[in-house]
């Protein structure tokens, strides 16, 4: 019954804000048409607004869970029009706070201690309140030196899980209906969108997980002059309560306060871009909810000429597979060099395009996306927009992007927005390119590769005795398969030639891999003899020969 009432309320809001066109061609549209005479329409002022603005207002009226839904939907620029996405980014996740005494009870249940024991002071008036949780100021009991440390305690809203489950169940039902009846369901992919929202909300409901995210990010940036991450107080953290060191700063979009504090906004904007690319390509652990409200600037007067960011809210973090990291980095470098052919090849190699797509067709599509950007002033070029448009090209071939890539493009868009707000003339390309080149040099340097091989040495040594037998068995199968092939046409002869080339490439690649293994073994054993730096000469020779063999195998594609 509650679900029916909730669905009817959603229907009334859709009609009042004149959003029924979104359901055109579905059974829901027919039901709404019947109900339309009985629902008061929005004022002329609201009716005059754009569809994106009307959708934003409707989501705000439906409540905090739908606000969160709109915020997540705003990141899916591959699915919704740009004008709607821009409006949804204006959604504010601020709601009426719940009772401070209820927050105290939740903290006591989570920690298994009375608040009066766990904290020297706990302010029941929240500092901030959002749809999932609210934040309270507190003070820890004195430590061994008699110091009382200031902290903040993030507390989940009471019964939030039940509210989310009910609304998500309703969204699943609506998504199923839209998927069955909407003429553009294959493009919208409603069930996929709802599943993404469900996953995001589920992650934000576990504050212990958020604490772990903050702890990992802090470890990567400890001692940095670019980014500060508050310390997690693990003794006062549980699934429904997260305690962090209290930090003071200025929101990154409050330009007036930044100027009053004497902050070098130009230096700060460049740092923001560098921090993002370092998180993605060095650490492979990036803050994926990096809007201005979650990025503060350290207000310490001594840092005004060398400012640093403060990260907040670690509920959503992103990671890429090694393959996506590599292909994305290479894609950025191809964009920097205007190498459209390479961009097309990378999209196919990465699996973002079907393997049977014509490379020249894809090259032309990449050129049509990128060239208009290169005619703009450098301060107006957006890598995020280029990436989004390239992924939209991929959508023509009905491929589904990985959620982490969607997270990344949304985060890049946010970071560019913050950077341009701080410094409207920010040349993102000039800042990003040297950072990316340096990280790639370090990531794929011989020393780094040998170090990775050395880490895997025990695993390699364990499986090494089986390698000759496995290689021999595989080659034998290939030879037998070739002899059994009955060639009857020129196409089959071409296929046979292709298979022979493939076998040669595989053998060359296996040889190269074997030589790299030998290089790693020699490096790990520290043999007597000549050294070049800290690496044995024979390791350099074996590693160089192995790398050359792998390069030859790659060039013979």
UniProtKB/Swiss-Prot annotation:
Chief place where the protein resides: membrane
One GO location term (cellular component): plasma membrane
Its transmembrane ranges are 506-526, 535-555
What keywords appear on the UniProt entry? ATP-binding, Cell inner membrane, Cell membrane, Kinase, Membrane, Nucleotide-binding, Transferase, Transmembrane, Transmembrane helix, Ubiquinone biosynthesis
Output one GO BP term.
regulation of ubiquinone biosynthetic process
Q: What class of enzyme is it?
A: transferase
The pathway where this protein functions is:
Cofactor biosynthesis; ubiquinone biosynthesis [regulation]
An MF annotation (GO) of this entry? ATP binding
Subcellular location field: Cell inner membrane
Topological type in the membrane: Multi-pass membrane protein
The residues that hold ATP are: 127-135, 154
Q: Where is the active site?
A: 289
The family database entries (PANTHER family) matched by this protein are listed as: CHAPERONE-ACTIVITY OF BC1 COMPLEX CABC1 -RELATED, PROTEIN ACTIVITY OF BC1 COMPLEX KINASE 7, CHLOROPLASTIC
Which protein family is named in the record?
Answer: Belongs to the ABC1 family. UbiB subfamily.
Instruction: Please identify the protein, giving its name as recorded.
Output: Probable protein kinase UbiB
Origin species, per record, is Xanthomonas campestris pv. campestris (strain B100)
Taxonomic lineage from the root: Bacteria, Pseudomonadati, Pseudomonadota, Gammaproteobacteria, Lysobacterales
